[in-house]
């Protein structure tokens, strides 16, 4: 029986040793005082304590709770790893932001280099057509108002019509035509109508007077043959003289004055020009 009791006692001692071993492997739960002191040492610059420092720290912190040397060693290792992860995360975020900013900056710079600024773009077609139309109208108005525009066909026709109204001879079949056109500028030289071969021609006053003085086409007989035109001087209207001082020298002058006063012209008859011609012919026949 003695050996059996010894075995039981030895078995009981082994069980107690196993229980102590299990209890010693429990996880370390630091107290707030221990954590505060460890963080103060870490902020002070201690990162990897040696064996002597670990024993001193363990002896100092054991007064606030259960702690071992390995607990102090692992705490410093884990704290450094957490700081490295935080730093790496911050570096990754900052690098990502910098890369995005660089990408957008490069993209915008390339777009600005490819696309020209708005002021360098050519004008649109509607604006160009409107500007060309406006310019054409302005040029046309300037050509009508300029003194040298009398040489163009349109301006020449307008000047001729104005001259026909103000300073020209009137024909019987065109006396009561359309309303008179506007007057031309005073700088334009006065024009004359004369009948040449049955058609009206507009000439300057000096040239018309020169032709009339040097050619026999403007004789009274020629004018009578060409529709019986009554001449009208192209000078400003003079104040009317008293009837007592006016001398009627020919029937042609009387007819011309009456036609000018009435506003129209009528064909001249042979009897008006030569009232005694018919009587002489009758006398010769008798």
Swiss-Prot record:
It is found in: Nucleus. Gene3D superfamilies: Homeodomain-like. Pfam families: Homeodomain (PF00046). It comes from Oryza sativa subsp. japonica (Rice). Its main location: nucleus. This is Putative WUSCHEL-related homeobox 2. Residues 1-25 are annotated as: Disordered. Belongs to the WUS homeobox family. GO terms for cellular component: nucleus. Signal peptide: none annotated. Transcription factor which may be involved in developmental processes.
């Amino acid at each position: 029986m003695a050996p059996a009791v010894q075995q039981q006692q030895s078995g009981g001692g082994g069980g107690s040793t196993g229980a102590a071993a299990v209890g010693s492997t429990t996880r370390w739960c630091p107290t707030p005082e221990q954590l505060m002191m460890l963080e103060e040492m870490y902020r002070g610059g201690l990162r990897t304590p040696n064996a002597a420092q670990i024993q001193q720290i363990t002896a100092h912190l054991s007064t606030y709770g259960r702690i071992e040397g390995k607990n102090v060693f692992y705490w410093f290792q884990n704290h450094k790893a957490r700081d490295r992860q935080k730093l790496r995360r911050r570096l990754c975020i900052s690098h990502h932001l910098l890369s995005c900013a660089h990408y957008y900056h490069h993209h915008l710079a390339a777009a600005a280099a490819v696309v020209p600024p708005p002021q360098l773009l050519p004008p649109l077609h509607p604006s160009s057509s409107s500007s060309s139309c406006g310019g054409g109208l302005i040029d046309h108005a300037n050509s009508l108002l300029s003194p040298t525009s009398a040489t163009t066909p349109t301006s020449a026709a307008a000047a001729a019509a104005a001259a026909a109204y103000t300073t020209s001879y009137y024909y019987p079949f065109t006396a009561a035509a359309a309303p008179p056109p506007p007057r031309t500028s005073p700088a334009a030289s006065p024009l004359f109508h004369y009948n040449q071969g049955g058609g009206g021609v507009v000439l300057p006053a000096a040239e018309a007077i020169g032709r009339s003085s040097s050619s026999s086409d403007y004789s009274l007989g020629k004018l009578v043959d060409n529709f019986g035109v009554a001449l009208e001087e192209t000078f400003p209207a003079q104040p009317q003289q008293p009837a007592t001082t006016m001398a009627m020298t020919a029937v042609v002058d009387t007819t011309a004055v009456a036609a000018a006063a009435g506003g129209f012209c009528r064909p001249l008859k042979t009897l008006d020009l030569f009232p005694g011609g018919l009587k002489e012919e009758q006398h010769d026949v008798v």
